[in-house]
Amino acid sequence: MPWEEIEHTADAAFRVWADTPEDLLVEAAKALFDLITDLDAVEPEEEVEIEAEGGDLVELLHDWLEEIHFRHEIDGMLFSDFEVKELKKEEGWKVRGVARGEPYDPDRHPFHTEVKAVTYHNMKVEREDGRWVAEYVVDL
């Protein structure tokens, strides 16, 4: 599992690592939904397109996670599989991808915790020892 929950006083914080920025976005989204439910219980039956942008990789990560979280909140979806189809840097960063999952079913999906929002607090994205590393905090 290429992420770990790290200590934070009132909220939940994660440190995520990957070989590429694309994989970093995927693993950050998996960590977010692993906090909400058991990923193994969520079947990737429906596909939702996700687009996000940011002036830098921190803003992009925030917008990516917030867009996925928004689809969870508004559509009642749980996601377990994510794919970045395109990541490009022009004037800023843009990502286009998909989140796969299914509608929340309380009989099948254990509820771990409610995530209110992804925050910018202590958020970072950087290269460390040849791999990409991100840290982020979610408001519970």
UniProtKB/Swiss-Prot annotation:
GO annotation, biological process: tRNA splicing, via endonucleolytic cleavage and ligation
Origin: domain of life: Archaea
Cited InterPro entries: Archease, Archease_arc, Archease_dom, Archease_dom_sf
One Pfam family in the UniProt entry: Archease
MF-aspect GO terms: calcium ion binding
Binding-site list for Ca(2+): D11, D139, L140
Keywords, alphabetical: Calcium, Metal-binding, tRNA processing
Family to which the UniProt record says this protein belongs: Belongs to the archease family.
Function: Activates the tRNA-splicing ligase complex by facilitating the enzymatic turnover of catalytic subunit RtcB. Acts by promoting the guanylylation of RtcB, a key intermediate step in tRNA ligation. Can also alter the NTP specificity of RtcB such that ATP, dGTP or ITP is used efficiently.
Protein name (Swiss-Prot/TrEMBL): Protein archease
Organism this protein belongs to: Methanopyrus kandleri (strain AV19 / DSM 6324 / JCM 9639 / NBRC 100938)
